[in-house]
Amino acid sequence: MSLATNNAESKFPSLQRLPNHVAIIMDGNRRWYKKHREECGHTHTSGHYYGAKVLPNILNAVLDLGIKVLTLYTFSTENFGRPKEEIQEIFNIFYTQLDKQLPYLMENEICLRCIGDLSKLPKGIQTKINHVSRMTASFSRLELVLAVNYGGKDELVRAFKKLHVDILNKKISSDDLSESLISSYLDTSGLTDPDLLIRTGGEMRVSNFLLWQIAYTELYITDTLWPDFTPQDLFEAINVYQQRSRRGGK
């Protein structure tokens, strides 16, 4: 684990030893809003609006680097415990951004994939996710993975339920159980595990995110709140990652 230096002059990372898969816990929207309440003049959840505005610049930087997978913790299973007004605004922003960014995704050959228990999302958002996913399914320059109504524990429970059904139906045997088989039942089936997990906002925890997948992932924590996160902050995280010696527990 590493804390950020918040170096605004972070250089463009070496193209050697780039992480193939970067995951980000985009934390700090509400704290950012509390700091900027007077200048924002919106509701108490408006930090999410400003957080959404960060994403195009980060996507451009990821494309420039040639990273292949970017996974973003967009909405957790626990977030359903927040005030209804905040949840509604988050969903409104999410729907609007999916609609607005579809031309950008197609122009830049970005494939959208959403993970989590999507069945509990509003029907309109489910429909929009399915539409954007279908429209971008053939692209491979970058896979953008949005974790929506996602929780690492919930993902494992859902995976084990599917495994149990397949064992009962004799599609597989309990003797077949292995790490790779379990991985194939997860939402992230077919994806490599994250090489680098970035958390903005300074909190020192993983918040039920990709619990199975981050067993050997490098962690990087920055105090920068998500609406203030820039490509330079991303470069700094990758520069630190490139200085690590990854041993995979060996």
UniProtKB/Swiss-Prot annotation:
Leading EC class: transferase
The residues annotated as the active site are: D27, N79 (proton acceptor)
SUPFAM superfamilies, sorted: Undecaprenyl diphosphate synthase
Q: What is its EC number?
A: 2.5.1.-
Transport keyword on record: no
- A molecular function GO annotation: ditrans,polycis-polyprenyl diphosphate synthase [(2E,6E)-farnesyl diphosphate specific] activity
Source superkingdom: Bacteria
Q: Which residues bind Mg(2+)?
A: D27, E218
Cofactor binding: number and manner: Binds 2 magnesium ions per subunit.
- In its UniProt record, which GO terms are filed under biological process? polyprenol biosynthetic process
Q: Which UniProt keywords apply?
A: Magnesium, Metal-binding, Transferase
Q: Which positions does UniProt annotate for substrate binding?
A: 28-32, 48, 76-78, 80, 82, 199, 205-207
The cofactor required is:
Mg(2+)
Please explain the role this protein plays, according to its UniProt record.
Answer: Catalyzes the condensation of isopentenyl diphosphate (IPP) with allylic pyrophosphates generating different type of terpenoids.
Oligomeric and partner information: Homodimer.
Stored HAMAP family: ISPT
**Family listed:** Belongs to the UPP synthase family.
The protein here is known as: Isoprenyl transferase
